[in-house]
Amino acid sequence: MPAKTTSARLTHLDDAGLPTMVDVSDKQVTARSATAESRVHFPAAVAAQLRANGLRSAKGGIVETAVIAGTMAVKRTHELIPFCHPLPIDGCRFEIDWAGAHVLQIVCTVRCVHRTGVEMEALTGASVAALTVYDMCKALSHSMRIGPTKLLSKRGGKRDIGAAR
């Protein structure tokens, strides 16, 4: 079966193929939101130990530390991803809980009122929170696995994706 063709183009490349930051000055200012998730998969024995300890490690509260790190990452996304616009973040919320016997689910929702979306901020927040969980737990095992990390929804731009949260 032949591959589908699309007229979509990469927005961060100019007509000469050089990398560029998208000019959003002509876009409408709208309420924007995005939700992303990342998951941390633990070996069974590590998950059992974490559950028994109330998600606390020798370094402190795992969930609390992941929320702080994820929030810091959301606010600094434009410093990490070259063509992300610096955005006035109006809200950032994390939900972190078990999604199965050995999997910790991290959901990050970001909101702002601006000309461009906050998908990268939500993805960065969820990713850094997951990396922080790994860091907090690596003394117990290096067999943890992070992923998938994915966009669950976005609202307020040209097209909405996923279910509203």
Swiss-Prot record:
Its EC number is 4.6.1.17. It holds the Pfam family MoaC. GO terms for biological process: Mo-molybdopterin cofactor biosynthetic process. It catalyses: (8S)-3',8-cyclo-7,8-dihydroguanosine 5'-triphosphate = cyclic pyranopterin phosphate + diphosphate. This is Cyclic pyranopterin monophosphate synthase. It comes from Xanthomonas campestris pv. campestris (strain B100). SUPFAM superfamilies: Molybdenum cofactor biosynthesis protein C, MoaC. The keyword Lyase applies. Belongs to the MoaC family. GO terms for molecular function: cyclic pyranopterin monophosphate synthase activity. The active site is at 135. InterPro entries: MoaC, MoaC_bact/euk, MoaC_sf, Mopterin_CF_biosynth-C_dom. Homohexamer; trimer of dimers.
